[in-house]
């Protein structure tokens, strides 16, 4: 069978808050009871019951403004998916640190850093603006 494509040049129905009156009614093909109700609508509206007024509204519109403004629960799905991917990434990082990367080099030890700093001070590395400029060589302590 062949599927009939939608002609987008024709007016269409859409429920949007910024476009409150769509070009066409929500229900395009009326049943016999809906046609009778539309005929009754042409008379005085005071003779219509509340249910008939609601039915007339539902023929014209799919949702009311309250229904359009009602929040959805989509944010829960988004937050859940984000937390899943954050957790998955954290597990990958933990596994990489444990099984892929080796131990830190010995140059990261506090003793090694202290020896390297003392060596840089002894060599007077960058005496104008750098490390050696902040060291008092007479008192053997950092300048205050």
Swiss-Prot record:
InterPro entries linked to this entry: Cyt_c_oxidase_su4, Cyt_c_oxidase_su4_fam, Cyt_c_oxidase_su4_sf
Keyword presence, Plastid: no
PTM annotation (N6-succinyllysine): residues: 4, 35
Location of the protein in the cell: Mitochondrion inner membrane
GO aspect biological process, one term: mitochondrial electron transport, cytochrome c to oxygen
N6-acetyllysine sites (modified residues): 4, 35, 42
Modified residues (Phosphoserine): 31, 33
Membrane-spanning intervals of the chain: 74-99
Signal peptide extent: none
Mitochondrial intermembrane side: 100-144
Subunit (UniProt): Component of the cytochrome c oxidase (complex IV, CIV), a multisubunit enzyme composed of 14 subunits. The complex is composed of a catalytic core of 3 subunits MT-CO1, MT-CO2 and MT-CO3, encoded in the mitochondrial DNA, and 11 supernumerary subunits COX4I, COX5A, COX5B, COX6A, COX6B, COX6C, COX7A, COX7B, COX7C, COX8 and NDUFA4, which are encoded in the nuclear genome.
Family in the record: Belongs to the cytochrome c oxidase IV family.
Function according to Swiss-Prot or TrEMBL: Component of the cytochrome c oxidase, the last enzyme in the mitochondrial electron transport chain which drives oxidative phosphorylation. The respiratory chain contains 3 multisubunit complexes succinate dehydrogenase (complex II, CII), ubiquinol-cytochrome c oxidoreductase (cytochrome b-c1 complex, complex III, CIII) and cytochrome c oxidase (complex IV, CIV), that cooperate to transfer electrons derived from NADH and succinate to molecular oxygen, creating an electrochemical gradient over the inner membrane that drives transmembrane transport and the ATP synthase.
Protein name: Cytochrome c oxidase subunit 4 isoform 1, mitochondrial
Protein's organism: Aotus azarae
